[in-house]
């Protein structure tokens, strides 16, 4: 099935090269102008911090949680891929729920640069973090404590050059943004009757950065839009799930498991955002 979808997508790219090029240019512009300036220096700092803490034999689980919450995806997933050996599966799944987040700089930096009010950005960041924490607690309590995760990666892979590793991580983010932006553009060609808001939500499910920018451009500030943004960023988009799975597949974490955790995180983030907006 996946191969068939890839062939169909390749056919559409060849059939509509103008649409593909335009979507790629837009995605690369978002990545280069809005994502890299905020994400890259922050990711370097997070990796340097993690390296320092790792050298002091800081416990693996708290370190993965700290790095994931500080740096967002795929930093936490990368850390889990090299430090999950010996963890209980319930602990690994709970940490996947906690660390499958978006960088805090996306909320206070990128979204604010796109015109979202600072107060709303801070509420979105709070809802995102609390939603991940609530998801962590739920998974920790409800997941059966089965076996332990085998060590499938060597810790040396986590001890590279922080700057070089960050470059490749940011390039991976850019590749996923472009791929899923092109996918969203091809779907819009197939269904031209979709309204602009519908296209924004669709693209957000596939690729969060471009989708959020389109949603901000096509809708004004409102309770419904802000809660929707919390839900969508809590989910993270298939782009982020793909990036995380590239690291976590060596731990035996399936895409279906990551999808379920993302849906739980989206539900929690949306509920917290609605509560915050109601309180303030």
Locations of regions flagged by a protein language model:
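Membrane-core helix-loop-helix motifs of multi-pass transport proteins
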Residues: 86-140, 248-271
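Juxtamembrane boundary at the C-terminal end of a transmembrane helix
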Residues: 272-280
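Small-residue-rich segments of transmembrane alpha-helices in multi-pass membrane proteins
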Residues: 7-8, 34-40, 100-104, 155, ...
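Juxtamembrane transmembrane-helix boundary signature
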Residues: 39-59
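Selected transmembrane alpha-helices and immediately adjacent juxtamembrane segments
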Residues: 4-40, 44, 122-194, 271
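Alpha-helical membrane segments and immediately flanking helix-loop junctions
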Residues: 58-115, 202-218, 225-249
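Pore-lining and gate-forming transmembrane alpha-helices of multi-pass membrane transport proteins
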Residues: 26, 30, 123-124, 199-204, ...
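Transmembrane helical segments that form the transport core of multi-pass membrane transport proteins
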Residues: 163-233
């Amino acid at each position: 099935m996946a191969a068939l979808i890839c062939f169909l997508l390749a056919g559409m790219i060849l059939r509509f090269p103008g649409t593909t090029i335009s979507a790629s240019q837009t995605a690369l512009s978002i990545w280069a102008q809005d994502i890299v300036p905020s994400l890259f220096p922050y990711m370097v700092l997070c990796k340097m911090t993690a390296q320092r803490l790792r050298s002091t034999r800081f416990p693996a689980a708290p370190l993965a949680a700290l790095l994931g919450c500080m740096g967002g995806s795929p930093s936490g997933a990368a850390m889990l891929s090299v430090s999950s050996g010996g963890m209980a599966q319930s602990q690994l799944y709970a940490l996947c729920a906690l660390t499958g987040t978006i960088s805090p700089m996306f909320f206070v930096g990128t979204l604010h640069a796109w015109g979202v009010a600072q107060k709303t950005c801070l509420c979105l960041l709070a809802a995102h973090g609390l939603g991940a924490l609530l998801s962590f607690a739920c998974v920790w309590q409800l997941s059966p404590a089965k076996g332990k995760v085998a060590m499938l990666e060597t810790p040396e892979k986590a001890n590279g050059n922080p700057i070089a590793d960050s470059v490749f991580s940011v390039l991976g983010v850019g590749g996923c943004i472009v791929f899923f932006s092109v996918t969203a553009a091809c779907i819009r060609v197939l269904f031209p009757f979709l309204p602009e808001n519908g296209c924004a939500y669709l693209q957000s499910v596939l690729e969060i950065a471009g989708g959020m920018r389109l949603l901000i451009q096509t809708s004004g500030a409102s309770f419904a839009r802000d809660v929707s943004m919390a839900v969508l960023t809590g989910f993270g988009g298939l782009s982020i799930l793909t990036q995380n799975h590239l690291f976590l597949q060596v731990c035996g974490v399936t895409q279906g498991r990551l999808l379920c955790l993302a849906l739980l995180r989206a539900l929690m983030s949306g509920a917290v955002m609605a509560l915050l907006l109601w309180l303030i």
